Amino acid sequence: MRSVSPALACRFLRRRVKPRLTFAQTLTEAARAFALNFPYEAPEGGFRRQRLGGVPTETCGAGTPLLYLHGGAFFAGTPKSYRPIAAGFAAQGFQVFTPAYRLAPRHIFPAAFEDARAAFAALAEERGAVALAGDSAGAGLALGVMAARRRDGESLPGAAALFSPWTDLAVTGASARENEGRDPMFTRKMLKTASHAYLAGASPRDPRASPLYAELSGLPPLMIHVAEDELLRDDALRFVARARRAGVETTLRLWPRVPHCWQLAQGVMAEGLASLQEAAGFLRERAK
């Protein structure tokens, strides 16, 4: 198996992806830049298609049901592009369901949230106990769905694992400025552009879009992993602080010198595999 160091992945992203994201004139161009992400590999076989709550969904593996909400800043990403993570969780004993929720700018807020909520509701009704995970925008969706279901008295997952959650679409975290030169992939302007495209005039403090502003009491145990040098670091840190004040069991780990969503490299990067295995163990233990 090829081995990729975090430094090599960061260098690739800084040279090949970040400039294209920074200077993209349209979201279509930016989505193409996302597709240039470091060439992480996943097996082609073993992925099946179905629908969950009317949402096209890709599934793989067998075992504990896990709904995985992919990232992509609400305008990019597909279940196929996140197969490395799905395959990684499947190898840890989960049946992974990755919904293809609707994306901006064609589908604006709250389309992605509604799709994520519908997919979770359908899977929970079908399978009962369900684990939940996601990265970046998808991690934010996962948190928003849980907060909404708790508010409405609906069942919650036994636990959730979140990688670099985007919890504040108002982009007010200090790290969005402090880490702009260190983050190998994103700029603050790009986050704001993505936020505006998805929200289309809706409030960035709507808890369905930004779970940082949600009522958090009563949420299940959470594990959050985030990179020290990424723009979204403080989205994670501020959310964890609020969740703990609300009495939510929350495990946080800060990872040095890794790129955003390094778990995509779990097949070739030791740090990616370690993060994914920690998350899988956390979810598995609380699914008992």
Regions found by a protein language model. Name each.
Residues A147-A202:
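Hydrolase active-site cap/lid region
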Residues G63-A73:
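Short beta-strand element of the alpha/beta-hydrolase
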Residues M1-T59, K288:
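A glycine/proline-hinged amphipathic helix-loop "lid/cap" segment
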Residues V268-K288:
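Catalytic active-site module of serine/aspartate enzymes centered on a nucleophile-bearing elbow/loop
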Residues G134, G138, A142:
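Gly/Ala-rich beta-loop-alpha elbow adjacent to hydrolase catalytic centers
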Residues I224-V226:
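Short beta-strand/loop motif that positions the catalytic acidic residue
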Residues L132-G134, F163, W255:
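Short beta-strand immediately N-terminal to the catalytic nucleophile in serine-hydrolase-like folds
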